[in-house]
């Protein structure tokens, strides 16, 4: 199972808006995710598009280094998440000498691509809990 990780840090997109875009591609095939992101109207779709393309390239390099065959059609977005980065604090001058604070938020975006493994495809059924409840 090939797994490749790509991260971008301190990207100037608010985490809430980035999560909206990342939620669209989670669980999809990598090529399908690129197609979705290419035509998504959100501003956060451009950095996420570049990140998925980088993760595909990372998987290709990782497969070459380990001398394994990698079919890029098999790659899918196994995990994708957005964490909040540092917040740039700016001030907006207001009337009568006041100042309002403006928070310019940043995001750390992580995308993990993986190939489906035969062991994962045939996951064993979870065992039912056999613990008995205490009766009064």
Curated annotation (Swiss-Prot):
Q: Which UniProt keywords apply?
A: Ribonucleoprotein, Ribosomal protein, RNA-binding, rRNA-binding
Q: Which Gene3D superfamilies match?
A: Ribosomal protein L22/L17
Tell me the SUPFAM superfamilies matching this sequence: Ribosomal protein L22
A GO-annotated cellular component = cytosolic large ribosomal subunit
Return the Pfam families for the record.
Answer: Ribosomal_L22
A Gene Ontology annotation in the biological process aspect, one of them, is: translation
Regions annotated as coiled coil: none
The GO molecular function terms of this record are: rRNA binding; structural constituent of ribosome
The source's domain of life comes to Bacteria
Q: What does this protein do?
A: This protein binds specifically to 23S rRNA; its binding is stimulated by other ribosomal proteins, e.g. L4, L17, and L20. It is important during the early stages of 50S assembly. It makes multiple contacts with different domains of the 23S rRNA in the assembled 50S subunit and ribosome. The globular domain of the protein is located near the polypeptide exit tunnel on the outside of the subunit, while an extended beta-hairpin is found that lines the wall of the exit tunnel in the center of the 70S ribosome.
Q: How does it assemble?
A: Part of the 50S ribosomal subunit.
Family per UniProt?
Belongs to the universal ribosomal protein uL22 family.
* Protein name per Swiss-Prot or TrEMBL: Large ribosomal subunit protein uL22
Q: What organism is recorded for this protein?
A: Leifsonia xyli subsp. xyli (strain CTCB07)
Organism ancestry: Bacteria, Bacillati, Actinomycetota, Actinomycetes, Micrococcales
